[in-house]
UniProtKB/Swiss-Prot annotation:
Natural source organism: Synechococcus sp. (strain CC9902)
HAMAP family referenced in this protein's UniProt entry, alphabetically: Glycogen_synth
Official protein name in the record: Glycogen synthase
Binding-site list for ADP-alpha-D-glucose: 15
Biased composition, class Basic and acidic residues, residue ranges: 474-483
Amino acid sequence: MRILFAAAECAPMIKVGGMGDVVGSLPPALAKLGHDVRLIMPGYSQLWSKLQIPDEPIWRAQTMGTEFAVYEAKHPTNGMTIYLVGHPVFDPERIYGGEDEDWRFTFFASAAAEFSWNVWKPQVLHCHDWHTGMIPVWMHQDPEISTVFTIHNLKYQGPWRWKLDRITWCPWYMQGDHTMAAALINADRVNAVSPTYAQEIRTAEYGENLHGLLNFVSGKLRGILNGIDLEAWDPATDKALPANYSAADLTGKAVCKQVLQERMGLEVRDDAFLLGMVTRLVDQKGVDLLLQVADRLLSYTDSQIVVLGTGDRGLESGLWQLASRYPGKCAVFLTYDDDLSRLIYAGSDAFLMPSRFEPCGISQLYAMRYGSVPVVRNVGGLVDTVPPHDPNADRGTGFCFDRFEPVDFYTALVRAWEAYRHRSSWQDLQKRGMTEDYSWDRSAVEYDLMYKDVCGIKEPTPDAALLEQFSRGQDADPSRADQIDVEPSSSSSAPMTPPGRNPLNRLFGRRSG
């Protein structure tokens, strides 16, 4: 099956969050199942030094009144074909942010749609997060291309409809207040990156004001757990580590701990309980919760804390102040460094993820793979990946807490600290986490089933009045539309675009060839 990924990130070249890991690692696993998977992404200026890109593009075209070029390259580790949308708007050294962010990603989405119609036509176009949210809208009237939309983080929803009307051409059948909502309505299948998150986003607490809409489209919504690349993340072969180790022999992990303590300016103590955290410093990740309990933890236990990440200035300042109060016990590195992140996974005894919400989370998978026991909140993908430690039954791989409260988090930390005193059982806990199978091969099978289910399928345009009623949280069941007194919208009977025609032609005022 021909599958085209459209995304704003791809590891290891361009990575800000978990989406980059998914886009970089899932395609090779799908290729093992016989699929021809390719990627289209923005041609960021950083990529020209990281990939071998020919001087001449393979295609030139125009969209949104702007010319662009598409270059072909290969993924540096797995050989996947990558198409880069080249335009000066992608030249600045940034991925997200900037005043032109909405225009920039809408332009990319439009270019990706044009490429799919005119150069390499996939059977399934797999879109990732709001940056590609307009693609399912434009593809909705093309019977030859089915669309899948993956929600990596529902909190970020893209430009609102009024702005889209100004910067691009919104089809007459488009519904939804913003890019994310439009994608949820028009995609033929929707998935979240963990089963628990797929259920949570249908509630008011985690639905980011889209829970009504997500309940409306629940028939095409599913949760598929993320995985990790077990070859790229293997402590037995990782060249970034000062010593390698495995579940069968943990000797090298003690060496990694000592090197981490030395590099971060901590007291070099084998008996210290070293806690690691590699994260974006944002509200979602629970860094504020750590700041509320860290003083007590560092004052009354022999714990040490290492934090790596960047983000909110207030959280950065709070962490700097914490480190200054506890020299030798707390260290903060406000940047992102892949080699250092691997050393933290390898050198830490436990790994912190006290998230407010967590669509899936990949850091806890890396941590377990490297023998760092996760301390997490029971939310989203953390529920699906970190079973709670049960010392009586010798089960579980981490320590969990339920409420987003300092006392709950602190209690979980103390439980982990006490468990660390019993080294033999602690090593058993580490080994259970290291031998769990969270490979992409398992996840790829579920994506394969979804692709086969959606290929050749086009979901009908939902009735506008019924959609509006359901999105406002009213008790409407889309399967019982005949029992609800609403007027059918004209879009419900709109004719499909004939095969071989580009639905954007009439939007751009062009004739079909």
